[in-house]
Amino acid sequence: MLSLAAKLVAFFWRTADTPREEAGQLEPELAEGDTKLKTVRGVVTRYCSDYGMIDDMIYFSSDAVTSRVLLNVGQEVIAVVEENKVSNGLKAIRVEAVSDKWEDDSRNHGSPSDCGPRVLIGCVTSLVEGAGCISQTTYFSLESVCEGFEPCKGDWVEAEYRIRPGTWSSEATSVKPLRYKRVDKVCISSLCGRNGVLEESIFFTLDSLKLPDGYTPRRGDVVNAVVVESSQSCYVWRALCMTLVKRRDAAPVHEATHFYGTILLKNKGDIEVTQVTHFGTLKEGRSKTMVIWIENKGDIPQNLVSCKLAGWDKSKQFRFQMLDKDQMCPVVSFVSVPEKENSSDENINSLNSHTKNKTSQMSESSLVNNRGISPGDCTCKGENGEKDNILSRKQMTEPEPGGLVPPGGKTFIVVICDGKNPGRCKELLLLCFSDFLIGRYLEVNVISGEESLIAAREPFSWKKLKSSQALTSAKTTVVVTAQKRNSRRQLPSFLPQYPIPDRLRKCVEQKIDILTFQPLLAELLNMSNYKEKFSTLLWLEEIYAEMELKEYNMSGIILRRNGDLLVLEVPGLAEGRPSLYAGDKLILKTQEYNGHAIEYISYVTEIHEEDVTLKINPEFEQAYNFEPMDVEFTYNRTTSRRCHFALEHVIHLGVKVLFPEEIILQSPQVTGNWNHAQDTKSSGQSTSKKNRKTMTDQAEHGTEERRVGDKDLPVLAPFTAEMSDWVDEIQTPKARKMEFFNPVLNENQKLAVKRILSGDCRPLPYILFGPPGTGKTVTIIEAVLQVHFALPDSRILVCAPSNSAADLVCLRLHESKVLQPATMVRVNATCRFEEIVIDAVKPYCRDGEDIWKASRFRIIITTCSSSGLFYQIGVRVGHFTHVFVDEAGQASEPECLIPLGLMSDISGQIVLAGDPMQLGPVIKSRLAMAYGLNVSFLERLMSRPAYQRDENAFGACGAHNPLLVTKLVKNYRSHEALLMLPSRLFYHRELEVCADPTVVTSLLGWEKLPKKGFPLIFHGVRGSEAREGKSPSWFNPAEAVQVLRYCCLLAHSISSQVSASDIGVITPYRKQVEKIRILLRNVDLMDIKVGSVEEFQGQEYLVIIISTVRSNEDRFEDDRYFLGFLSNSKRFNVAITRPKALLIVLGNPHVLVRDPCFGALLEYSITNGVYMGCDLPPALQSLQNCGEGVADPSYPVVPESTGPEKHQEPS
């Protein structure tokens, strides 16, 4: 039974032999008109700044040099040479220096491809027929893949590769999985469409799964499998092959064989049925009729038992009537569907009077049954006399007179479509004859009137980039130096520039393989390549940012005056396109005249919506007479330079911090006794209603305020006391009786605070793993306060990736009411405007203007980037005893290192708080992402053995080593029905519902819920995605209109009215955000927040509406036309964990089912009976019975709630 799996395992490490002769026959591609290119090896005999000679025969320019090794006279090189047809001279178009390493490894001193193969560890990023790419750039053919392994996008592989000298690209010669294992007797826990999951942790897809002949996987089957490491949405393993161990006892009713294919649609029994059954485009509120003819071309009469609808369309937009053969065929017409019961007769279908009379008669006939059924509800005889399991006998109706179609006779059905649900829709019409069944798809595309308000204003066209020739045209440019920008701080500026290497820039711009510049990228991250690898990734991100900014450059712009300053209007600035900040540099150029242009350097001093105030050379400001100017945006490299600087200065932290393996226990920092009576009182089951509310508010909003008296603070003894008593008081603050400032923390939160305070494993980073709504920030606040008061020698640096997160920490510490004045300071970036800082935080910001003074405060709060300011004033290593990084999962590793470099590697303590399952750092360069810049320091540590989940060793401690990780599991935000799916997909079913029941159950009675007591709606919309103008962003008018309607229903609901400020709309595309805001503005609901997933991280709303936008069902195979960044499990997790009481998801199930996370959400919604809208794909049709009461015992169905219940206090 396991022969297939055994064969795959046996050959996993056997590489297919590839003749070396084939590799040597690869010729460089020739441009049109070239004679021939050849590769030569020689020595540089002359080298100047912009050109050189090889063997005094071959000329090359500096642009042709692609090696990262600096060229010198006498340097051995390999060059691709072409011959000039006119002069017969030789010119090198690419020159690569031969490094010493290559010379040592090379046997015959040939080209780089002749050197020993190098090893690449990477992820398969693309696959086409017969080939693929690893980490975006390294090509491999399937012939180089080890036998038995069929790679899939997302698989982690180990490959041997060489550099092809003709094209300077890397090509893998051997590919095998990085890690694999065999798992026995595991259960198929989920199967949605063609995707499934084993034991809720191993992904598989039927598109690439190897199976024994005759076996089709089914939910509940017990199987053995061989799995490989692979990044598949929220899963890290992929099943390669699978064999059955034990089949489920019996298939449930809804898993019966589908009969939807060509057999069902095929004409049978000499009966021919109209083939074209598409209603085309129909306006909402209108109706359209269609005649479907049924003709008997045989010699025997055929009995039509019944005609039914399969019930795919939940909106019931289709209805039909069958007329006798002697009746006149009705005229196809368009009519309005009455919106009210007392509508006039003009809104009724205008069939002839005979037809109208017959309608009332036939509506009661057994031949017309407009009741939704599932395809397993009727049984008819097939052509061979066998039973077809399609319609159940209990729903069959006896044939009435007129159901017989004689030989040569005809009858017809009038099908009416009422436009109700915007978007495309498909229904299945079943014509059940006595001996066979014929089906036809009924399709329509319904459009609403509101869609015209947001229709595309102009056709989409790609923005044309300026040609390289235009960018490098000869000019004489005079640079007028502007006065230095005003700075609130006069800091020594010794931060090195870390310029981007020219050869790296050429690799990106000319699309040369990045491994030719930095082969270390192919290696796993380690201490020896740490700095070089991250420096290259930072430069790649900078290059992309610069290229992106160039797309926003403007020409012929006229500036406006505002007093002595000039104002530039930048369209799209309010949406972050481009992203500008105060202090950024812009270049203004006069229009070119006779090849001359004057260039002025300006600085941004103020930003208001799309108006940017500039500070330029005073002479220019006075002389400017509204002449048109060209504007170039520049990338602010300050944060990047600080990251480079940190990479150089964190080396002292060493392997024990950056690559921790062993745990060496140290003596605890605090040895005091905790007030267990306080613990018991705050966490007991009998906590009062007031305390329960306080706990919920504290976990959700962190607004708990508690004024601590003198007895709670470690105050030094009065100076009047004896000296010995004073010394004893100083030496024993660690032994004092400990109490929590926030008494309503739950047990996990208290344990985390105690472990942070103890610091047993310092300097190893301690991780506070905080899933959504579990009170992570509240725990950090308590830990900071405890360290501050228990350790009088401490100096705490609290950082976060964003200003908003840093402000929140500062606000919560301020609201604690326990800190003395001049204890805490908030350090802002120089360019941050004071107006956008909340009032409660402003006093702490004023103390932060003087960096020297700020560095002496006991608690310093800033962003990760701004913590680099302390390097500039010469703060020594060890200045900070504790470094807390909140939302550490959102910071790139180099960014997180900026504050860590200021901490001692011996006695310092690092605390990283965040969730590796939520959004990581924002990285735009695909190359930088492919090589790991998008993985945060927090996430990388969590993947190391010391921090990994181990249920066997630490099952009693939350499955993680309690000395290094504490996972918070009590969720104070969401309803149970909304929490179950993310808990299962991302958090091992460990999240516990602890939210305030009066909040999370407040919308259970909303009249629009498909299932009362279940606050989730998945509304299927088969809309059309579109783009307009030169914007590459997508929008979906049908979904935008549906979002508008839900917002109106909620805001104006009689039974459950929701404030506009309590509703949030999440959509991944800027253009959809823009369109939804237009619609909401028309109905005066502008208080509803509409934004991307990134804008909602860390926030919560009573109601969340998600518009997924993408709806193209025809181009699944092309990432550019499929889900794009929508298929990101971390974005999915953030989106569905924002609501407290209601989640509404709008999307096309035919597209979303291909993503594992959205597929799981669809399965969850259908099984619990909360799916509505368009028809489902055939792969999901079988699940509809689960929502109608036929539940699959292997899949969790959440019981519906009826309202607020008694809330049990967390222990």
From Swiss-Prot:
Residue stretches of biased makeup (Polar residues): 345-372, 674-688
Q: Where is this motif: DEAG box?
A: 886-889
Q: Which GO terms describe its cellular component?
A: cytosol; P granule; pi-body
Reactions catalysed, as given in the entry: ATP + H2O = ADP + phosphate + H(+)
Which positions are annotated as binding ATP?
A: G770, P771, P772, G773, T774, G775, K776, T777
What keyword terms does UniProt attach to this protein? ATP-binding, Cytoplasm, Developmental protein, Disease variant, Helicase, Hydrolase, Nucleotide-binding
Under Enzyme Commission nomenclature, its number is: 3.6.4.13
Give the span(s) annotated as Disordered: 340-385, 674-710, 1192-1211
Check the record and name the Pfam families matching this protein: AAA_11 (PF13086), AAA_12 (PF13087), MOV-10_beta-barrel (PF21634)
The record's GO molecular-function terms, alphabetically, read: ATP binding; ATP hydrolysis activity; magnesium ion binding; RNA binding; RNA helicase activity
Q: Which domain of life is it from?
A: Eukaryota
Indicate, by first and last residue, each region the UniProt record lists as having compositional bias (Basic and acidic residues).
694-710
One biological process term from GO is: male meiosis I
User: Where does the record say this protein resides?
Assistant: Cytoplasm
**Mind telling me which SUPFAM superfamilies this protein's record contains?**
P-loop containing nucleoside triphosphate hydrolases
Q: Which InterPro entries match?
A: DNA2/NAM7-like_C, DNA2/NAM7_AAA_11, MOV-10-like_beta-barrel, P-loop_NTPase, SF1_C_Upf1
Disorder: Spermatogenic failure 73: An autosomal recessive male infertility disorder characterized by non-obstructive azoospermia due to meiotic arrest.
Membership in a protein family: Belongs to the DNA2/NAM7 helicase family. SDE3 subfamily.
Q: What does this protein do?
A: ATP-dependent RNA helicase required during spermatogenesis to repress transposable elements and prevent their mobilization, which is essential for germline integrity. Acts via the piRNA metabolic process, which mediates the repression of transposable elements during meiosis by forming complexes composed of piRNAs and Piwi proteins and governs the methylation and subsequent repression of transposons. Involved in the primary piRNA metabolic process.
PANTHER family linked: CANCER/TESTIS ANTIGEN 55, CANCER_TESTIS ANTIGEN 55
**What is said about its interaction partners and assembly?**
Interacts with PIWIL1. Interacts with PIWIL2. Interacts with PIWIL4. Interacts with HSPA2. Interacts with PLD6.
Protein name per Swiss-Prot or TrEMBL: RNA helicase Mov10l1
Per the UniProt record, the source organism is Homo sapiens (Human)
From which lineage does this chain's organism come? Answer: Eukaryota, Metazoa, Chordata, Craniata, Vertebrata
